[in-house]
């Protein structure tokens, strides 16, 4: 909840389920013992990110074609140091090694140029209404 508005943030219970189903798809950065940034998301054969995916960790398919990114999170005090970018690069590298078709995430308008720097292409407004927000679907095809 420190990284996202309450309506958009995953609950502790949702994170527990995510860790249970796809712990290998969390990219973490620590400062000493403190978690300061992380990226997470599951793998699926579905090419588009849906609201259902945020809520149902059990939809993870380890052999799926697409790495979804549900959150790029950095605590406010550690933002603008490149930590999120490092984790995004690690997620991209892992997806390549695993033979995925690519990665998909959604973001608000102001972040489209940020994700474009990593090779993500804006595919237009997403069907997702997660947190009652308009999201752009971004895709990086490998």
Regions found by a protein language model. Give the residues of each.
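A short, well-structured alpha-helix characteristic of acyl/acetyltransferase catalytic modules
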Residues: 1-2
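Active-site rim helix/loop that mediates acceptor-substrate recognition in acyltransferases
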Residues: 5-32, 36-59
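Conserved acyl-donor/pantetheine-binding loop and adjacent beta-alpha core of acyl/acetyltransferases
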Residues: 38-73, 79, 89, 128-135
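Conserved G/P- and acidic residue-centered "switch" motifs that form tight phosphate/ATP-binding loops
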Residues: 82
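Conserved GNAT acetyl-CoA-binding A-motif
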Residues: 88, 93-108
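C-terminal "cap" of GNAT-fold acetyltransferases
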Residues: 108-109, 124-142
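Conserved acetyl-CoA-binding loop of GNAT-fold acetyltransferases
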Residues: 116-126
